[in-house]
Each structure stands twice: as structure tokens, then as C-alpha cells.
Amino acid sequence: MKIFILVDALRSDYISQKNTPFLYNLSQKYYYIKKIKPSLGFCERSEIISGLKSEKTGFFTAIGKNKQKSEYIKMSKSMSILLDMVDSILKKIPVIRLFNKNLNWNKAFRKIINKILTKKHNAKMSSYKIPYRQLRNFYLTEDEINHFSKKFFNQSSLVNKILSKNISINNKAWTYLGKKNQMSENEVKKYLINKNKSQKNEFIFSYLGSLDVIGHKYGPQSKEMENELMKLDLFFKKLIKSNLNSTIIILGDHGMKTIKSYFNIEPHLKKIKYDLGLKINEDFNYFIDSTMCRIWIKDNFKKEDVINYFERQKELTENGAIISPKVSKKIYGDIIWLANEGVMVYPDFFHFNKPIGMHGYNNSLLKSQGTCIIYSPDGKNINIENENLSKINEIIMKDFV
């Protein structure tokens, strides 16, 4: 039996005698890649399964622009305008303390509307904090196609390679955006521990996301993170001791950086829209990710004007830079502005509260990188300093399947 565990945001420097003594000891005895470098963007799962960098897969961020693929294409314009008006009003109402909890009217409204819209449009993609007038343009990119179907990168797919070895696939504990029956962290842990009773020749894909959640909320070097790392370390100790005859692959797909400053890019977008006489959905759209701003412009001449604006504005050049369009397809934007390390674009289209930690920065930065430890019954200590995330696919098939 093979157990693959994607540990979201398991940063390379978290493996230490202080933070994770069991995992550190494991790294000194078995297969260990100290630093895992993901591709730029937010599509690590497709990189792992396909064995290809994001430039090859075409997956750059989780959400792209293609009106024909949007699940919200039939959403009425009048309803979108009304919802945006209500949303705008509620943003101005301050958060209040009620029954020992913070009541955020805008967040409550968004959650209710999201439930209604996803049900009405049978949508896998959440509406998040995307302006309702723009919602009908966007769709899930990485998770549009089931990663476990034969359509997903047939030749290079890790799934198809495993199946070709007559090993069955188990993805009950895996994750993807829009999954309705996602196991909780504790359910995944119990599920994997109990697998020691199984004699089935299978490859289990599983996911643990607590480090990512805590890293965003409290910061990657917080006390809460230290506590969670200790819990995780104890879990892996228990898991491996109960599955000594299994191969267990522990993969951290990326790191996490403490946010140093927050940058509101919306005033610049409003100015561009007004100065160039642009209209939302007609010749102008934008998407604000946590570490980047993506812009679509219909008119190529006005596109040059926008680029010139970004390159002239001191506030924009001090906080980030326009990156080459070669890194992604047009569905991700005609113009992509990437924030500097430690800068978060806020407000964005995802967060109601300011996070403390963030990822999605330059992938060559040490704190943006993950790690990998592979335990196998007959394993030897192999220590590799760094490797690309896309190579994990090949390593698993060559040495552990």
C-alpha cells in the first residue's frame, strides 16, 4: 500500500529537531528533498498529478476568465447590479461584537448569497468576494476537469501511470475546489491510521490543510503554527508505526511568508477605468488575487496605456511589478501585476479579514518552498537539496511504485 499525503503549506524550514522531531529523524534516515520549488501561481495539485510545470499545464491561478465556461453565465445583469449595491452598503457597516463573536454583515450576506447562487446555478465554484457584475465571466481552471479522469494529461498523469501498474486508486481523502463531501482534518487522519487493517494493493491520495489555514490566519511563525506542527509530527509518528510495511509520501507543496504590508489596488483600477473610459464586462475586467492583480483589456492601444500607468505610478512599482504574459494563457489576464514578497493585495476577491501569512510570491524565495519526505520499508537515506514540484510525479513512479 502507498499513502500519498499532500500537506498544504508544509514549509521547507519546518522540518527541524525543534518543530518536528519525528519528521526530522525520518528525514535523516529515508528519502528527503529539503526544498520543493512550485511553479509560480496557485495550481500545485495539477502540477503534482500532471508532472508538468504550470507553463506546460496552462494552469496558473485557480480562477480564469472565460464567459462560455462560467457556471454563472445565466445570472441576470439586474440581479448582479442589485447584489453589488447591497454588498457595497454592507461593507460600510462596522463589524460588531455579539455573543462573544464578531458579526461582519458583509461576510454574512456573502455567505448566504453564495449558498443561494451555487444551488441555483448548480455551481462548483464559490462566488467568493468577486463583484457580482463580473461573476459571469469567471470559472474554475485547475478543477474544471477531474484530476482522476483519463482526460487529465493522459500520458504524464500520475494517476494513469499508477493504474497501468494494476494498482487501484483511492482518492476519498483528497481535495479540490467545490468538493461537497470533503473530509475534515481529523477524519482524514483517522481514515489513514485505520488503513493499517487493509491488505489491498492501492495508492491513496490524501490531503491535510491545517498548516495552510493556520499560516494564513495566525502567521507561518506563530505559536499556533508551532502547536499545529507538533500535532502533525505526532500524527505522522503514529501513522508510520501503524503502517510499517507501507510507503508513505509526505509532500509540502509550498511555503508561507509573513505579510509585511497591505496594498489596496482598487483606487488605481477605478482611476484607469475612468481615465480610459472603460466599461466593466464590455472592454475591461479585473481579478484581485492575494498576491496579484490580473487585468483584461479589449483594446490593445488602451492595454499599452494601462501598462504605462502601472510603470509610472510609484506606489505600484514599489509594491510589485508587471510579469511576462508568457507565464500564463490569456484566460488569466492580458496584464498581470505580481506583488513583492511580503506585500498582500487587500482588499482582494477572497478574504474578509486581513491574513497574517500568504503564499503565491516569487517561487525562488526560500520561504515560498515546500519539502518532501518519503518513508518506505526498505528505504535508504537519500538527501536531495532541492527539486521542482513537478518532478515528484517522476520520483514516485521511478522509486516508489
Task: Describe every region a protein language model picked out.
Residues S12-Y14, F42, K56-G58, K119, ...:
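Short catalytic/ligand-binding loop motif for oxyanion handling, primarily in non-cytosolic enzymes
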Residues S222-M225:
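Extracellular loop and loop/strand-boundary signature of outer-membrane beta-barrel proteins
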Residues M1-I3, N201-F205, T247, D334:
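Residue-level preference for the first positions of well-ordered beta-strands
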Residues I3-L6, S12, F22, E228-L269, ...:
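Metal-dependent active-site segment of extracytoplasmic phospho-/sulfohydrolases and closely related
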Residues I15-I63:
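Short, structured active-site-proximal loop/turn typified by the sulfatase FGly-forming signature C/S-X-P-X-R
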Residues L52-G219, Y286-F287, I297-N300, K314-E315, ...:
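His/Asp/Glu-rich, glycine-adjacent segments
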Residues M256-R294:
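Acidic/histidine-rich catalytic neighborhood
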Residues E282-D399:
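Active-site neighborhoods of enzymes that stabilize oxyanions during catalysis
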